[in-house]
Amino acid sequence: MLKVFNPSPVQVGSIECLQSAQNWQRKSLSLQGLNLLQSVLIKLTTGKISITTSSGEYITASGPMLIFLAKDQTIHITMEETHEQLNYNLIELDSASIKNAYNFFLYEHADFSAPLTKPTTKHLLAPIETGVARVFNLLHSSNKSQKLSQDKKEYLIRFLLSEFIYEPEAFALFRELSQNTLAENIYNIIISDISRKWALKDISDSLYMSCSTLKRKLKQENTSFS
C-alpha cells in the first residue's frame, strides 16, 4: 500500500474504505487518513459530509450534492444522517480521464481564457441537477460490470465534470490534475490485477526503472512503497 510521509503518522487507508463503510448502516461514520491517489467524485444523495484535508481545507456539504476531491491529498471525513438515511456513492477518476475532459472543455469554450496560475483549492462542489444522478449511477455500475466502452465512459465523465466548469478554480484544477504522478501510475498497475501480491521489483520492472530509482522518485513525491 502507498503511504504518505507524515510528521505525525495517522492511519492511512484507501478510498474504498469510504465506499464500503456505507454498509455499516450507522447514523454517522468517521474515517481518518484516507489517501487519495486518484481524484474522487462523490454523489451525496442524502446526509451531511464534513472533510478536513491535508492541504488545510475544511469542506462541509449536505445532499443532494456532487463533490470533487483532487488526488494527492489525505482526508479525514465524517458523514452523518440528516432527515434521511445517509446515502452516497463514489467514483475514482484517473488523470487521463480528467485530461480528456479538460481538453474537451477548452475546445468547447474557446472564448474562455483558462488561467495558468496554480489552483488554490483541491475540491469543487455542485448541486445535483436533473439527469446528473442517473449518469453518475450508470458510470458507477459500469465500473463494476465493465459493460461500457471506454469512449462511452469518457463521455459520461465529461458530462459529470461539466457541472463544475463555471467554478472559478475548475479549469486550473483540472489542468493540474491532468498530469500523472508516479504514485498514481503505481496505483493503476496494482488495481489492474488486485489478486496479485505486488513487490517493489514487480513495480519497478513494469515502469522500466531500478528499485533504487523508483524509491528515490517516490520520496520526491513524499510517498513510499510498502
Set out the residue ranges of the language-model regions.
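Short, Lys/Arg-enriched, Trp-marked, Pro/Gly-tolerant hinge/linker segments that flank
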Residues: 119-127, 144-153, 162-202, 206-207, ...
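Intrinsically disordered, low-complexity regions enriched in acidic/Ser/Thr/Pro/Gln residues
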Residues: 134, 138, 160-162, 185
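A general structural signal for short secondary-structure boundary/capping elements
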Residues: 88-92, 110-116, 134-141, 208, ...
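A short, N-terminal "cap"/entry segment at the start of jelly-roll beta-barrel domains
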Residues: 1-14
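Key DNA-contact positions within bacterial/archaeal DNA-binding proteins
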Residues: 212
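N-terminal regulatory/effector-sensing and dimerization cores
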Residues: 15-118
